[in-house]
A protein has these predicted regions:
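Short Fe-S-cluster ligation motifs
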Residues: 80-97, 137
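N-terminal alpha-helical interaction blocks
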Residues: 1-36
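C-terminal/domain-terminus segments
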Residues: 2-8, 113-141
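Short, non-ligating residues that shape and space the ligands of small metal-coordination modules
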Residues: 59-63, 109-115
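Short, flexible, mixed-charge glycine/proline-rich loop motifs
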Residues: 36-50, 91-97
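Long, charged interaction segments in nuclear RNA/chromatin-associated proteins
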Residues: 2-5, 46, 54
């Protein structure tokens, strides 16, 4: 069963931003601006990746997953572990997840990808049609 839908990858945007930093057109302080809440979420809810920080190169980046959705209530806007995401996907209808990479040393952070999780809502006004498989008569009967 495929859980992630409507996946958006921000790798090209990340590459362009890093090119700006490496060329000197964008300052390091402009991209190393993770707030304390994000850094704390990385410490307690994040998953260490195999990618080292592109700015300081001192440590592996940490991936933090943030959930958003009106029907999530107080959970919306919070960081969640992979295990919690699976649990939320079984309990709630569609909600979005934003994965941010963060360096806990220099505060580099960037959106890596976003996707939708949760039960798929049937389209409004859709009806189930009877087919030969679910009991309708066929022309040969």
């Amino acid at each position: 069963v495929r859980l992630q839908r409507q996946v958006v990858d921000y790798a090209l945007q990340r590459r362009a931003l890093l090119a700006e930093v490496y060329s000197g057109r964008t300052g390091v302080s402009d991209v190393c601006d993770a707030n304390p809440y994000l850094l704390r979420a990385a410490k307690f809810h994040g998953k260490t990746s195999s990618v080292s920080c592109p700015i300081c190169r001192k440590e592996q980046l940490t991936l933090v997953s943030w959930v958003f959705g009106d029907h999530l209530g107080a959970v919306s806007g919070s960081a969640r572990s992979a295990e919690e995401l699976v649990l939320l996907a079984t309990r709630f209808s569609e909600f979005s997840v934003h994965v941010v990479e963060v360096c806990r040393t220099c505060s580099w952070n960037h959106l890596v990808k976003s996707y939708v999780l949760g039960a798929v809502r049937p389209p409004k006004g859709s009806r189930t049609t009877r087919t030969a498989r679910n009991g309708a008569r066929t022309a040969s009967e």
